[in-house]
């Protein structure tokens, strides 16, 4: 089944990318996108940011006002600041609760769309061969392993194919990361070398 073959490979790529980037990073990016949408949560986020700016501004005005020379003005600013801070904390708690609900929903959806879907496919298509091997191409013992646990003899099961995809994706991903690190290393070395030379020249001038 070519479509199943590609689906399993694609799922393994997605799982590797999420694990490499980090689930928390992915959740954070999705949250930033979510609060840009026209929803009630985005309205709460905008109000929270506005209240935060107001609190910071009032605090700055309080710092610029002498509590001794301009006590009446300072006291008025203090009352406004305390009231704004209380409103900000209430709105921030509301946004925090919304984010907790969002994070829980995203975690469930992410697991269902990746690892959960993979488990479902492995169970549902456990008897379905991914592809058939040429007759007599490999010993029957190897054929039995490749068809494990329930695929017909002489075929490759979805479990074996999924494991092979995960291994290859991990190897390719690690190779790409190593290549990027190798390419970027000379630039970093040149920067360090330039900084060292500047330091030596500065000492000579002194």
UniProtKB/Swiss-Prot annotation:
GO cellular component: endoplasmic reticulum membrane; GET complex
Keyword annotations: Coiled coil, Endoplasmic reticulum, Membrane, Transmembrane, Transmembrane helix, Transport
Residues on Lumenal side: 1-4, 132-155
TM annotation in the entry: 5-24, 111-131, 156-172
Coiled coil: 75-100
Compartment(s) where it occurs, according to its Swiss-Prot or TrEMBL record: Endoplasmic reticulum membrane
GO molecular function, one term: protein-membrane adaptor activity
Gene Ontology biological-process annotations: tail-anchored membrane protein insertion into ER membrane
Topological region Cytoplasmic: 25-110, 173-206
Membrane topology note: Multi-pass membrane protein
Keyword Endoplasmic reticulum included in the entry's annotation: yes
Family indicated by similarity: Belongs to the WRB/GET1 family.
Complex formation: Interacts with GET3.
Task of the protein: Required for the post-translational delivery of tail-anchored (TA) proteins to the endoplasmic reticulum. Acts as a membrane receptor for soluble GET3, which recognizes and selectively binds the transmembrane domain of TA proteins in the cytosol.
PANTHER family tied to this protein: GUIDED ENTRY OF TAIL-ANCHORED PROTEINS FACTOR 1 (PTHR42650:SF1), TAIL-ANCHORED PROTEIN INSERTION RECEPTOR WRB (PTHR42650)
Official protein name in the record: Protein GET1
């Amino acid at each position: 089944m070519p479509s199943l073959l590609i689906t399993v490979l694609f799922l393994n790529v997605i799982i590797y990318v999420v694990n490499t980037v980090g689930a928390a990073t992915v959740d954070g990016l999705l949250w930033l996108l979510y609060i840009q949408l026209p929803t009630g949560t985005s309205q709460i986020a905008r109000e929270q940011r506005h209240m935060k700016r107001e609190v910071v501004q009032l605090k700055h005005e309080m710092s610029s006002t002498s509590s001794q020379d301009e006590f009446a003005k300072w006291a008025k600013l203090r009352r406004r600041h305390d009231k704004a801070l209380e409103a900000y904390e209430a709105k921030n708690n509301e946004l925090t609760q919304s984010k907790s609900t969002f994070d829980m929903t995203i975690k469930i959806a992410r697991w269902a769309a990746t690892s959960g879907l993979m488990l479902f496919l492995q169970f549902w298509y456990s008897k379905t061969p991914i592809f058939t091997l040429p007759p007599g191409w490999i010993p029957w013992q190897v054929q039995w392993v490749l068809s494990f646990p329930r695929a017909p003899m002489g075929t490759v099961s979805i479990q074996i194919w999924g494991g092979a995809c995960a291994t290859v994706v991990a190897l390719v991903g690690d190779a790409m990361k190593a290549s990027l690190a190798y390419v970027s290393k000379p630039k970093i070395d040149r920067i360090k070398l330039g900084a060292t030379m500047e330091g030596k020249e500065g000492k000579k001038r002194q």
